[in-house]
């Protein structure tokens, strides 16, 4: 019972080794047991033969002695005795030879057995070494198995922990998903409310503008009525002249028509302190809608018949905005100037003589203005802004008409197409969007692959300047890239000459280039020792006749180059104390306006 317990206490591998040793002992003992028994018998026979040989040798010596001691009766050996002794000697000799032969065989057998024993000993040593190695391997494997069991336990615990965490995260995810759904619904509701409030705000602004317009009209009517009541000095010569012009073949009798003509002549003859001053003051307080653009001032043929003058003198320096001014643009009639700044407003200014008089502001943007453009008639103003949207106002009543949203980044440029019914906008989100103002929707979105800093348009092509140093040419009809041109720096601005055959570009490598659109070749490169592009949206401009280009530098100087020679015509400084962001040249060719990162705008002309 105790042996059974001890055997049960042994590990299985020990019992396995013990059984293998017993099996090997049985196999080896069966193989050599017969040999060992035969060997023992041979040893016994050898000992027996040795004893017999010694006995025979003793008898051999004893027989002659006996014969010598006891010879025949006559004291001589007879023949029979001699013959017997000879036969006995031969027999003994043969037995001895046979014994020696067997002894040699046994000796050889002993040697062979010794060799076999040595081989077996070596095999046993090798087996013992293998057994020791196997035991060591078993020990290592047991240790490794123990480590693996420990790791398995750790992994099972970690797996259980992960399962618990996963279950907790799943519960959390389900809760967060519900919150997200609820938040999305709330966000949608807030967006809807926000859009409604924006619409109400736009309506409120439009109503306020309408009220202001009505108040101005009422004030104008009142002052006109008061001015009409004032006594007006009459010059007799004028009355006589009017009468002669109006009634050369009539009598001198006064008629109602003649009375009206005299009244009109009297009003025209009023001195500066009378009716005209009152009307001028009234119009000076009105918005820009009081100045409709004269049709003869609208530039139907750009660049034709313009008297372009290179600016030399600062006529007017004024604070245009509360902060940085990013954009400036003249109306087609050259009388109205628009500026856009980081104060989220577009301001309108009237340019007359040497002054710029503030006429009103266009509100509705939620972030800084980045780009401004008038339509070809000067009736609408388009502005891009940092709130991911573009907006359109009517100039005559300062009302917000359209808000174009859809970009996911700040809109850096927006331009009218030539039909004034479509718009192209470029954004920091690396897309260009094509808008239809009639349907008020985005017709197409094109992924450009890089942030768009500026846009210009021709009849069939849109050209965009990008952050990746490339100018891309897009076909309006297919809205695909026709070609690309890579410059040495990031593109900050683009402009077209009046004939729309040359493209002006400005880049961050401080170079301006004129590109011939007919040959796709760089026609002229402009640079100057002190000129440095101040930002990624520094705007440059052609003169109305395409003979000059103007750009502002980072140190606040205004540079003018000749397109024909490529040389600097004029450098104007000392007015701006910060980097110039944008430059505009009036369609009449008489004025240039520059705006900077401070709040200043400078009106330049040649004097």
Curated annotation (Swiss-Prot):
Question: What Gene Ontology cellular-component terms does the record carry?
Answer: Atg12-Atg5-Atg16 complex; autophagosome membrane; axoneme; cytoplasm; endolysosome membrane; phagophore assembly site membrane; sperm midpiece; vacuole-isolation membrane contact site
Q: Which residues carry this modification: Phosphoserine?
A: 139, 269, 287
Chain spans, region Interaction with ATG5: 13-43
Chain segments annotated as coiled-coil in the UniProt record:
79-230
Q: What is known of its domains?
A: The WD repeats are required for non-canonical autophagy but not for canonical autophagy. The WD repeats are required for the recruitment of LRRK2 to stressed lysosomes.
Task: Outline the subunit composition.
Answer: Homodimer. Homooligomer. Heterooligomer with ATG16L2. Interacts with WIPI1. Interacts with WIPI2. Interacts with RB1CC1; the interaction is required for ULK1 complex-dependent autophagy. Interacts with ATG5. Part of the minor complex composed of 4 sets of ATG12-ATG5 and ATG16L1 (400 kDa); this complex interacts with ATG3 leading to disruption of ATG7 interaction and promotion of ATG8-like proteins lipidation. Part of the major complex composed of 8 sets of ATG12-ATG5 and ATG16L1 (800 kDa).
Name the chain's protein.
Autophagy-related protein 16-1
Question: From what organism does this protein derive?
Answer: Pongo abelii
Q: What is the lineage of its organism?
A: Eukaryota, Metazoa, Chordata, Craniata, Vertebrata
Name of encoding gene:
ATG16L1
């Amino acid at each position: 019972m105790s042996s059974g317990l001890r055997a049960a206490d042994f590990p299985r591998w020990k019992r396995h080794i013990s059984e293998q040793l017993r099996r090997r002992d049985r196999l080896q003992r069966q193989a050599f047991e017969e040999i060992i028994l035969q060997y023992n018998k041979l040893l016994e026979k050898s000992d027996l033969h040795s004893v017999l040989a010694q006995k025979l040798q003793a008898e051999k010596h004893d027989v002659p002695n006996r014969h010598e001691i006891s010879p025949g009766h006559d004291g001589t050996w007879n023949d029979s005795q001699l013959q017997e002794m000879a036969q006995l000697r031969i027999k003994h000799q043969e037995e001895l030879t046979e014994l020696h032969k067997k002894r040699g065989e046994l000796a050889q057998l002993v040697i062979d057995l010794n060799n076999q024993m040595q081989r077996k000993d070596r095999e046993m040593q090798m087996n013992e070494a293998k057994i020791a190695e196997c035991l060591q391997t078993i020990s290592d494997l047991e240790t490794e198995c123990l480590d693996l069991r420990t790791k398995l336990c750790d992994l099972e615990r970690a797996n259980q922990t992960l399962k618990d965490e996963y279950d907790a995260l799943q519960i959390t995810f389900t809760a967060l998903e519900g919150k997200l759904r609820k938040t999305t619904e709330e966000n949608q509701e807030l967006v809807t409310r926000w859009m409604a409030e924006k619409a109400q705000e736009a309506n409120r602004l439009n109503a306020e503008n309408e009220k202001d317009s009505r108040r101005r009209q009422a004030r104008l009517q009142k002052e006109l009525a008061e001015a009409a009541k004032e006594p007006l000095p009459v010059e007799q010569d004028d009355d006589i002249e009017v009468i002669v012009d109006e009634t050369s073949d009539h009598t001198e009798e006064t008629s109602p028509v003649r009375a009206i003509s005299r009244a009109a002549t009297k009003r025209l003859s009023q001195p500066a302190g009378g009716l005209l001053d009152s009307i001028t003051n009234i119009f000076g307080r009105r918005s820009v809608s009081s100045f409709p653009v004269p049709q003869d001032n609208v530039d139907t043929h750009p660049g034709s018949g313009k008297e372009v003058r290179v600016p030399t003198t600062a006529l007017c320096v004024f604070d245009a905005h509360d902060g940085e001014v990013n954009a400036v643009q003249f109306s087609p009639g050259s009388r109205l100037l628009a500026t856009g700044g980081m104060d989220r407003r577009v301001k309108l200014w009237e340019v007359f003589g040497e002054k710029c008089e503030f006429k009103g502001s266009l509100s509705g943007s939620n972030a800084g203005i980045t780009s401004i453009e008038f339509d070809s008639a000067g009736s609408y103003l388009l502005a891009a802004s940092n709130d991911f949207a573009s907006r359109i106002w009517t100039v005559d009543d300062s009302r917000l008409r359209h808000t174009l949203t859809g970009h996911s980044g700040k809109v850096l440029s927006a331009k009218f197409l030539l039909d004034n019914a479509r718009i192209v906008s470029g954004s920091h989100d690396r897309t260009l969007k094509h808008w239809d103002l009639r349907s008020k929707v985005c017709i197409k979105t094109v992924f450009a692959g890089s942030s768009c800093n500026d846009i210009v348009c021709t009849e069939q092509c849109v050209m965009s300047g990008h952050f990746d140093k490339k100018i891309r040419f897009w076909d309006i009809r297919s809205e695909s890239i026709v070609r690309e041109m890579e410059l040495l720096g990031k593109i900050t601005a683009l402009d077209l000459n009046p004939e729309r055959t040359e493209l002006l570009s400005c880049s961050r490598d401080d170079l301006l280039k004129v590109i011939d659109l007919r040959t796709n070749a760089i026609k002229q490169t402009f640079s100057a020792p002190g000129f440095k592009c101040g930002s990624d949206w520094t705007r440059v401009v052609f003169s109305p006749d395409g003979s000059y280009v103007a750009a502002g530098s980072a140190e606040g100087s205004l540079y003018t180059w000749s397109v024909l020679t490529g040389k600097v015509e004029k450098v104007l400084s000392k007015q701006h104390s910060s980097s110039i962001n944008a430059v505009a040249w009036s369609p009449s060719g008489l004025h240039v306006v520059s705006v900077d990162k401070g709040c200043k705008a400078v009106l330049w002309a040649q004097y």
